[in-house]
Amino acid sequence: METELSETILPTVTKMYVCGPTVYNDAHIGHARIYVIVDLINRTMNKILNKPTHLVMNVTDIDDKIIRESKNKGITWLELARLHENSFFDCMSKLNVTRPDSVIRVTESISDIVLYIQQIINNGFAYIVSDSSVYFDSIEYKKAGYEFSEIDDEEEQQYESLLSKEIVSQKKHHKDFALWKGRSESDVGFNVEFIFDNQTFKSFGVPGWHIECSAMIKKTLGNSIDIHFGGIDLKFPHHYNECLQANAYHHPMYNPLHQSDTMIFHTWTREFIHVGHLCIKGQKMSKSLKNFSTIKEMLDKINSNQFRWLFMSTKWKQQVDFTDGLISIAKELDFTVVNFVNRVSNYPFEVSDVEFNDKETLLHDDFYRIQQRIYSYLTEFKFEMVARSIQHLIGTTNVYLDLPRPNESIVGKIRDYLLDLLDKLGFIYRVGNSSSSHKIKDLMNILIETRSQLRQLTRNPDLSPGIKKQLFDILDRQRNIQLPDIGIILEDSKDSSLWYENSCVQSSE
């Protein structure tokens, strides 16, 4: 059911849907990986590939977990849901994840969900049991010619364990799953009606987990979508059952028996994109296992750029172990960019250095090749290769800057290209307004000249070792502590020094 992305199938506006949070607790960094990757893909399509998108996200704000957790905390389920929904979007904002074009709550879509279920009943693919629950009819679905998996749904089995044997025995097939869960009037739920076998059934209950997304996609995006996002754990049964429901709702639109051999086979969702698990020591990070760090906790340790590098530097389809080493890689990537932009922005280029010789030609050609390579990687959403290419481009340019009389124009173009690319990918780097007035430059030139004279003095063989050490200590403290504290970076070479302001920072926006 999952296929590779193909640019040729994407329409003028790509309709996309991502399964959003179930808001009963704070979001963890496993969730962050999913939504940052979705954001990277969405930004790439819109800002780099020039493919407009319309992204919808649902919020599951009524669920057994929400009800259970609200009782534990002594607040209403709605209070708990709104609390964690606000927390989730606050975290997304801090990660610079673009808000979806449409955010839709389950509680605001009950009537749409009921209509969706009713159509499945009308098409003969659902039935009602004595507690007014509605079940998907897998036997009729298979009879109609649709493929059907016999793999067990653990979540459905867990739900059934809470039901009476009488209700379970009314299921036509053990694979039938709940579209609507009937509840006692004393429980949390909604009053709705269904028509089955020409009879009206009043039901108090809540939607089944899978039906929410199918119905809300229909409400917001129509009969079909182009790309459906989610974590790999949603591939089965959630996304699988969504497809069953959509096929049953639209029957016979997506039935292979009703499509001619000459036409392209139509499916409800053209592409599923599943993001791999973020693991702790090989075990999936999850709220139920309590082996996770929340996004809020991690934002106290790393900034949003480092968060984004964290997920860009690995293959997003694969399972990844979350380690200190992974955090170090992300911090190093962030430092590499900041250091490079600072160096270029404050490099003391000479106005006369406008030559374009062999070394400039080599850098220019390498720059062009890397640009083409990065674009190619972005068309395939190979973000880890983009990260490597950025590192390579910075490394190549830094080597060039170490040569005599570098050309400001080409180096500036590389810096501007990287800043523009990173901005489009959702990073927040800002080059601050340089405070390097002529007076500051004059002062720094005097300081550098004084340092040079003192360093020359230390080479005097008549100078005592004790005095030499004191001079070196003063010079080192000045370079390593005092100047960085006021935002100035000083780099000493054998006979001279280079200075620049630390002007590239993560924006506080």
Curated annotation (Swiss-Prot):
A motif ('KMSKS' region) lies at residues 284-288. Disulfide bonds: none annotated. This is Cysteine--tRNA ligase. Its cofactor is Zn(2+). It comes from Acanthamoeba polyphaga mimivirus. A motif ('HIGH' region) lies at residues 21-31. ATP binds at residue 287. The keyword Nucleotide-binding applies. Zn(2+) binds at residues 19, 213, 238, 242. Keywords: Aminoacyl-tRNA synthetase, ATP-binding, Ligase, Metal-binding, Nucleotide-binding, Protein biosynthesis, Zinc. Binds 1 zinc ion per subunit. GO terms for molecular function: ATP binding; cysteine-tRNA ligase activity; metal ion binding. It catalyses: tRNA(Cys) + L-cysteine + ATP = L-cysteinyl-tRNA(Cys) + AMP + diphosphate. Belongs to the class-I aminoacyl-tRNA synthetase family. Its EC number is 6.1.1.16. It comes from the Viruses. Gene3D superfamilies: HUPs (3.40.50.620).
